[in-house]
């Protein structure tokens, strides 16, 4: 039997990412043959990964990588936040973003077939990571964005990589593009413009806003405050020319009733119309980038600010770790606790 030296174990660990004991055991079983040991570890890793396949992985990181005129943002999941800080996991996320930006796959299936720096496919790399790290590690999704030479990428990660954003702007510069991405990270828009919002979605969100007003009015009534009116509209898509014209007529009637002289109406009406637009586009403000108040200049919306500097947003992608994933009640941490309790003979 070949001597299993510390140098041999170290070499296998560097090539496979396996732990010391797993590497030593594999070398013993393969009589010191590095290549056979790697294959054995891979087979065992696949078996371990298969056992973890049904677990919920809702923690993790995003990765962002810019490759010339192509940028990628990815989300990679683990079962616990602790593992998401592991250096091997971080390297895997960054390598994934890089190969996707360079390979430009059309979907997850094509992405999983890409070759990683290790020579493995992306899919095999995740199987290996699951085996060596000891948790389910999964590649969830990616977005690819391309730009022209005249446009600028804004790449930004927030909260230790839990949020990843890429934006493309026309005009301005890279610094402005990054500021826009910072805004996107903080304010969570889902689309660029109100034109992208579904009509039924707007109606449902408006109903939720009015329900919140009803609840607020109950509290106001208890302290003798007047009730707030319901919102009639939630999006610019609902503000037809007729609706806007009627709002202006209502304002004029209000000014007349207050006895305001007509010669000063032109100074008052624009401000009141701005207020009307603000009050009746709450859904837009929550979900559309251009309608949101810009965090770098709260006197303007994002759209107004960009217009003031002759710039525009072309496209953006925002990923937040775990969004849309329903965590099972019996997650990994609970499973560990249950296992420990069982070992101690507790219920």
Swiss-Prot record:
Residue numbers spanned by region Involved in Mg(2+) ion dislocation from EF-Tu: 80-83
Coiled coil feature spans: none
Annotated compartments: Cytoplasm
Domain of life, per lineage: Bacteria
HAMAP family reported in the protein's UniProt record: EF_Ts (MF_00050)
Function: Associates with the EF-Tu.GDP complex and induces the exchange of GDP to GTP. It remains bound to the aminoacyl-tRNA.EF-Tu.GTP complex up to the GTP hydrolysis stage on the ribosome.
Record family assignment: Belongs to the EF-Ts family.
Protein name as annotated: Elongation factor Ts
Lineage, top ranks: Bacteria, Bacillati, Bacillota, Bacilli, Lactobacillales
Encoding gene, per UniProt annotation: tsf
């Amino acid at each position: 039997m070949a001597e299993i030296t510390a140098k041999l174990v170290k070499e296998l660990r560097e090539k496979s990412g396996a732990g010391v004991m797993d590497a030593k055991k594999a070398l013993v079983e393969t009589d010191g043959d590095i290549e056979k040991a790697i294959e054995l570890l891979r087979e065992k890793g696949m078996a371990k990964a298969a056992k973890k396949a049904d677990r919920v992985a809702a923690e993790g990181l995003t990765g962002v990588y810019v490759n010339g005129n192509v940028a990628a943002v990815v989300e990679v999941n683990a079962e616990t936040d602790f593992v998401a800080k592991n250096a091997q996991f971080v390297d895997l996320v960054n390598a994934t973003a890089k190969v996707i930006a360079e390979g430009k796959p059309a979907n997850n299936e094509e992405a999983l077939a890409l070759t990683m720096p290790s020579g493995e496919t992306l899919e095999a790399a995740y199987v290996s990571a699951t085996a060596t790290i000891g948790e389910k590690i999964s590649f969830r999704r990616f977005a690819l964005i391309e730009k022209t030479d005249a446009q600028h990428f804004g790449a930004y990660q927030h909260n230790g990589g839990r949020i990843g954003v890429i934006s493309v702007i026309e005009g301005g510069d890279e610094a402005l593009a990054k500021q826009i991405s910072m805004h996107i990270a903080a304010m969570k828009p889902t689309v660029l413009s109100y034109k992208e919002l579904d009509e039924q979605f707007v109606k449902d969100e408006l109903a939720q806003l009015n329900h919140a007003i009803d609840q607020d009015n109950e509290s106001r009534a208890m302290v003798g405050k007047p009730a707030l009116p319901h919102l009639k509209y939630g999006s610019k898509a609902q503000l037809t020319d007729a609706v806007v014209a009627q709002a202006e007529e209502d304002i004029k009637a209000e000014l007349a009733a207050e006895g305001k002289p007509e010669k000063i109406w032109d100074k008052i009406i624009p401000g009141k119309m701005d207020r009307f637009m603000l009050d009746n586009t709450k859904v837009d403000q929550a979900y559309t980038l251009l309608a949101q108040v810009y965090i770098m200049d709260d006197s303007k919306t994002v759209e107004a600010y960009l217009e003031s500097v002759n710039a525009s947003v072309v496209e953006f992608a925002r990923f937040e770790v775990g969004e849309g994933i329903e965590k099972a009640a019996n997650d990994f941490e609970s499973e560990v606790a249950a296992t420990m309790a069982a070992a101690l003979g507790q219920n």
